[in-house]
């Protein structure tokens, strides 16, 4: 799959769940599927990085279900999703020698994932009559898309 499409997909994951995207990238780098050694993002493939991101992702999956969690569209959450999408796009871009375009694709994906994910979740909330099943569907979508993206590297 072309690197720009992969960067857009993983950016979309960052828009859905900001820590799931770098978790997938870190595991791919650690496994050797994403060759980042010797680059500025080589730390993504270090032995501890995937575990740290995994813990952060689990924390985010739990925190997302709490009623006090702020909207993903609020500036802190939105900026975090943009940073995550850009970072993950950069990782793909470094490995594919297409850094600027993949960063841009990661950013665009994060915007699409943030606003598209919010709209989809609100629609699912209306359909289910409650938020929890909608949130779980979104979790599964983020994990599934991330797995597909790294399997396509």
Predicted regions and their residues:
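Mid-bilayer segments of alpha-helical transmembrane spans in multi-pass integral membrane proteins
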Residues: 83-94, 103-119
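Alpha-helical transmembrane segments and their juxtamembrane interface "caps"
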Residues: 27, 31-35, 44-63, 77-81, ...
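The first (N-terminal) embedded transmembrane alpha-helix
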Residues: 9-29
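Core segments of transmembrane alpha-helices
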Residues: 60, 80-89, 138-143
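Cytoplasmic-side transmembrane-helix entry/capping segments in multi-pass membrane proteins
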Residues: 71-83, 105, 130-137
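Final/C-terminal transmembrane alpha-helix of multipass membrane proteins
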Residues: 136-152
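C-terminal ends of transmembrane helices
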Residues: 58-72, 115-127
């Amino acid at each position: 799959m072309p690197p720009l499409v992969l960067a857009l997909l993983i950016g979309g994951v960052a828009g859905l769940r900001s820590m799931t995207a770098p978790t997938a990238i870190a595991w791919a780098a650690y496994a050797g599927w994403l060759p980042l050694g010797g680059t500025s993002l080589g730390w993504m493939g270090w032995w501890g990085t995937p575990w740290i991101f995994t813990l952060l992702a689990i924390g985010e999956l739990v925190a997302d279900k709490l009623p006090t969690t702020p909207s993903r569209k609020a500036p802190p959450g939105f900026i975090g999703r943009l940073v995550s999408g850009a970072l993950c796009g950069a990782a793909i871009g470094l490995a594919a020698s297409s850094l600027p375009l993949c960063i841009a694709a990661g950013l665009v994906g994060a915007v699409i994932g943030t606003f598209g994910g919010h709209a989809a979740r609100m629609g699912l909330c209306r359909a289910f009559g409650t938020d929890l099943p909608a949130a779980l569907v979104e979790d599964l979508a983020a994990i599934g898309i991330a797995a597909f993206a790294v399997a396509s590297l």
